[in-house]
Amino acid sequence: MTDFTLSDLEKIVATRARAAPEESWTAKLVAAGQTKAAKKLGEEAVETVIAAIGEDRKNLVDESADLLYHLMVVLNIAAVPLQDVMSELARRTSQSGLQEKANRQNP
């Protein structure tokens, strides 16, 4: 078990995003812009789905790590703090999933 958290990842992404693009993949991706970063996020999402369907546990773990990393990059570019996402998850999980979905459809 590790003590590493998504907050740790968010901080690492923020630090590396400020580096020179020739020194950091994160900085290079951030410099390429949100469209490029979002496409990479989508690619990683598809690879994660394929790993899940293929029941390949090791690959699913690896692709999930890539997916979370690229999500943090997209959030960083959009200036959306992880805490905003976590707050939304907390709000949604304070009620049943079916009730939450109904509330979104009938505001």
From Swiss-Prot:
Molecular-function annotations in GO: ATP binding; phosphoribosyl-ATP diphosphatase activity
Cellular component GO terms held in the UniProt record: cytoplasm
Keyword check for Transmembrane: no
Keyword tags: Amino-acid biosynthesis, ATP-binding, Cytoplasm, Histidine biosynthesis, Hydrolase, Nucleotide-binding
Keyword Cytoplasm listed: yes
E.C. no: 3.6.1.31
Chemical reaction(s) catalysed: 1-(5-phospho-beta-D-ribosyl)-ATP + H2O = 1-(5-phospho-beta-D-ribosyl)-5'-AMP + diphosphate + H(+)
GO biological process terms held by the UniProt record: L-histidine biosynthetic process
Pathway: Amino-acid biosynthesis; L-histidine biosynthesis; L-histidine from 5-phospho-alpha-D-ribose 1-diphosphate: step 2/9
Disulfide bond sites: none
Entry's family note: Belongs to the PRA-PH family.
HAMAP family named among the record's database cross-references: HisE (MF_01020)
Name of the protein in its database record: Phosphoribosyl-ATP pyrophosphatase
Organism, as annotated: Rhizobium meliloti (strain 1021) (Ensifer meliloti)
